[in-house]
């Protein structure tokens, strides 16, 4: 019997945007999915994992939470990420994997790592174990309005690649869906300005307004939004 490739949702967004809130919403409403979750935290203590573990207890048989700490899955923990993905996919216990990236993670290297793994398996005549289904960036509407002039500041040239501006821009540029969280905190004009900026950064991204991460799961899971062919221009990473 041919093993089915497990779809992956990659969840990105800066600290405080609402990634963990959204993830806990998914856990409470997973509607029959058997979900495995990988939570990345750059510190020694994975705070987000502890918050998620509480809700995971509700679905003990259908949920597993794995923490990756002391580094970023976009750089120092690439190999650890692949090992965990392979183990979860090979266990035959889950039909969906969600990765919550650290707030300072860049999404492109993570997507490259997963794509690289599939390319390697294909070159060896082996079936893929997992694949990217959707990349979601959770954005804080209030913060974009108050600190980034409704996002317009992100369109200005940025010389510091490690700055918050550059990171937010990368997260918004490289995603399939933007969850505009805390949407109730800004007025309609501000929302429209923010959406216009998002579409300038990523013209094909879908935008979903949300409060407290409340989104229909059908808009998040098994969307087939990520098309690896569209990203073949990306340089594949060296995994060490």
Question: Where are the regions a protein language model picked out?
Answer:
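Nucleotide-state-sensitive switch-loop elements of NTP-binding domains
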Residues: 3-9, 17, 21-165
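Short boundary motifs at domain starts and secondary-structure transition points
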Residues: 1-2, 169
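A short, hydrophobic C-terminal helix/tail in secreted or cell-surface proteins
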Residues: 235-240
């Amino acid at each position: 019997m041919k093993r089915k490739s497990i779809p992956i949702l990659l969840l990105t967004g800066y600290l405080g945007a609402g990634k963990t809130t959204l993830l806990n919403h998914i856990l409470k409403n997973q509607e029959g999915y058997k979900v495995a979750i990988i939570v990345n935290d750059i510190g020694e203590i994975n705070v987000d994992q502890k918050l998620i573990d509480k809700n995971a207890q509700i679905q003990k048989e259908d949920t597993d939470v794995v923490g990756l700490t002391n580094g970023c899955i976009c750089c120092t923990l690439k190999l650890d990420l692949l090992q965990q993905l392979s183990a979860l996919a090979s266990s035959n216990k889950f039909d969906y994997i969600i990765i919550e990236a650290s707030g300072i993670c860049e999404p492109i290297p993570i997507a490259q790592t997963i794509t690289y793994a599939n390319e390697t398996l294909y070159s060896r005549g082996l079936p893929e174990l997992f694949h990217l289904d959707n990349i979601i960036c959770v954005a804080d509407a209030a913060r974009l309005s108050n600190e980034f002039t409704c996002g317009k500041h992100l369109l200005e040239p940025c010389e510091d690649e490690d700055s918050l501006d550059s990171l937010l821009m990368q997260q918004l540029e490289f995603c399939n869906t933007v969850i505009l969280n805390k949407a109730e905190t800004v007025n309609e004009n501000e929302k429209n300005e923010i959406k216009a900026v998002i579409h300038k950064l990523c013209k094909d991204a879908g935008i979903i307004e949300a409060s407290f991460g409340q989104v229909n799961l059908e808009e998040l899971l098994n969307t087939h939004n990520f098309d690896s062919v569209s990203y073949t221009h990306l340089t594949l990473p060296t995994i060490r």
